[in-house]
Amino acid sequence: MSVHIGAKTGEIAERILLPGDPLRAKYIAETFLEGAVCYNEVRGMLGFTGTYKGERISVQGTGMGVPSISIYVNELIQSYGVKTLIRVGTCGAIQPDVRVRDVILAMSASTDSNMNRLIFRGRDYAPTADFHLLRTAYEVGVEKGLALKVGNVFTADMFYNDEPNWETWARYGVLAVEMETAALYTLAAKFGCRALSVLTVSDHILTGEETTAEERQMTFNEMIEVALEAAIRNGA
């Protein structure tokens, strides 16, 4: 056991999907995994291990934001030996050519979080996805005929921000806003692991367009399939 995860040694697979919502973790386990067993209920942050196409896979809720995902990624890697981590979640688009229901593969992540400034003593660090996971996820998405975008996302430290300045980030090519990827990529790099964020565009920040619950669920399923295929095709 670790501080925030109640699993025993060996109960978590080396490949894991990371939704923010623990109920999404339960949904993924029940919908996509065979023989799924719950290994964690600490703080209501559900975690499950099962198989997908015969390959062992885990799924763990992380909560929202850099501090929360950092806790789970640190413990999954250091206490349980996880090697491949794929975030699956939603984001808000800030580019006119990115539409709701599109799937974004986050090649890199800008951020206003001070996490990396603290780690690197005031200097900037460029959190980046694992190339092999990114390439495989892109190939799977193309095979499925999905509306894919690949590029930089912005990891925000605040959900409610009175002065977000999205126009500047958009001018520099950032595709969308979310709250976890920069931390995931930084920690994966620190420990020599592989990481990727696969994100569904749930709303458009500039236009105000939003998806319905049904639309989000349909696109979410496609996103999960991309993430699962990327995980098993790249081994541990």
Swiss-Prot record:
It catalyses: a purine D-ribonucleoside + phosphate = a purine nucleobase + alpha-D-ribose 1-phosphate; a purine 2'-deoxy-D-ribonucleoside + phosphate = a purine nucleobase + 2-deoxy-alpha-D-ribose 1-phosphate. Keywords: Glycosyltransferase, Transferase. PANTHER family: FI09636P-RELATED (PTHR43691:SF11), URIDINE PHOSPHORYLASE (PTHR43691). Homohexamer; trimer of homodimers. HAMAP family: Pur_nucleosid_phosp. Gene3D superfamilies: Nucleoside phosphorylase domain (3.40.50.1580). Its EC number is 2.4.2.1. One of its GO terms (biological process) is purine nucleoside catabolic process. It comes from the Bacteria. The record marks R216 as: Important for catalytic activity. The gene is deoD. One of its GO terms (molecular function) is purine-nucleoside phosphorylase activity. Pfam families: PNP_UDP_1. One of its GO terms (cellular component) is cytosol. Belongs to the PNP/UDP phosphorylase family. Phosphate binds at G20, R24, R43, R87, V88, G89, T90. Catalyzes the reversible phosphorolytic breakdown of the N-glycosidic bond in the beta-(deoxy)ribonucleoside molecules, with the formation of the corresponding free purine bases and pentose-1-phosphate. A purine D-ribonucleoside binds at H4, E178, M179, E180, S202, D203. Disulfide bonds: none annotated. This is Purine nucleoside phosphorylase DeoD-type. InterPro entries: DeoD-type, Nucleoside_phosphorylase_CS, Nucleoside_phosphorylase_d, Nucleoside_phosphorylase_sf. The active site is at D203 (proton donor). NCBIfam families: deoD, PRK05819.1, PRK13374.1.
